[in-house]
Amino acid sequence: MTTSSPLIAIVAGEISGDILGAGLIKALKVHYPNARFIGVAGEKMLKEGCETLFDMEKLAVMGLAEVVRHLPRLLKRRKQVIDTMLALKPDIFIGIDAPDFNLGVEEKLKAQGIKTIHYVSPSVWAWRQNRVHKIASATDLVLAFLPFEKAFYDRFNVPCRFIGHTMADAIALQPNRQEACRLLQLDENQHYVAILVGSRGSEVNFLSEPFLKTAQLLKAQYPDVQFLVPLVNEKRREQFEAIKAQVAPELEVITLAGNARAAMMVAEATLLASGTAALEAMLCKSPMVVGYKMKPLTYWLAKRLVKTDYISLPNLLANEPLVPELIQADCSPENLAKHLSLYLSQMPEDVAKKNALKQRFMELHQYIQCDADAQAAQAVVDVLNRE
């Protein structure tokens, strides 16, 4: 590519994608100060100067029922993006996450000779692995946060670049517990356990009871311990409080409006659902127990669809069972409390194990701390410069 002012199209479908898009635009401006950015943008991308075809929130739908209800509108929006891009002929199109929306766009554009990148690999390595063929036909390059994702694509000869994880860039290698205590207005001499019941309504429904009963068992064993419960919004707080009133009305907990990251930095141990929270706990160097429950039919299907040995990102990254994963029937208060109590124990052998675990967390953090924004921008430059 000879132009120093490329037209770069970027589509983000939700808040997390908007954050990634803004970081990418900022890093791309170092290479191309006169580039023009257009696509579907949220607040942060708009601040970086990206033009948007429509409000990003028009793409942000959660859950199958909501997707089905909004399908005609989503298809109309996708056609609008495709038609606009074919008319504008950008030098490159970057779809950030939202694979159900973006891969269809990328496939159409690539067929017309427009270079395409998909930023954030779908969990194709874990389930519905046949999607890799669609990804191959839709993209010139996949940008992956995690090294095992690249290893998966390599098996299928799909171009993929491991860029590190933006969260690993955002969290310091040595978490500042003192600062986190100040932020949350907590006594730094106190012992805390963080309890994360999930961000989805279904997770709060399934996990609040076993997690609260676990807290009761720990309190009986360690009377000085206090429990921090960060909740993503007011709706989830009300949902959690209603379950707590039924299950453990006497148990004292400190509920927090968000601030999960600070809570995990403060805590001696964290009890959480699987997902990105487990990676965040690892980066905060918080020893954790992963517990998960779901509807029996969902679990039956998941058992047959999921192709990985582990469900939590720390274990997947390490390719070994670093942290306990207690799923479905195993996710009992007794089991959860037994594993968590080892992190609270002051017995020399337990303290040594806990310190060794934190050291592994540190090594994994360093492994995926690569300045992902800059790496992603360089990948875009490399694809643009390809003939």
Swiss-Prot record:
Condensation of UDP-2,3-diacylglucosamine and 2,3-diacylglucosamine-1-phosphate to form lipid A disaccharide, a precursor of lipid A, a phosphorylated glycolipid that anchors the lipopolysaccharide to the outer membrane of the cell. It is an enzyme of class 2 (transferase). SUPFAM superfamilies: UDP-Glycosyltransferase/glycogen phosphorylase. It comes from the Bacteria. The gene is lpxB. It catalyses: a lipid X + a UDP-2-N,3-O-bis[(3R)-3-hydroxyacyl]-alpha-D-glucosamine = a lipid A disaccharide + UDP + H(+). One of its GO terms (cellular component) is membrane. Pfam families: LpxB. This is Lipid-A-disaccharide synthase. Pathway: Bacterial outer membrane biogenesis; LPS lipid A biosynthesis.
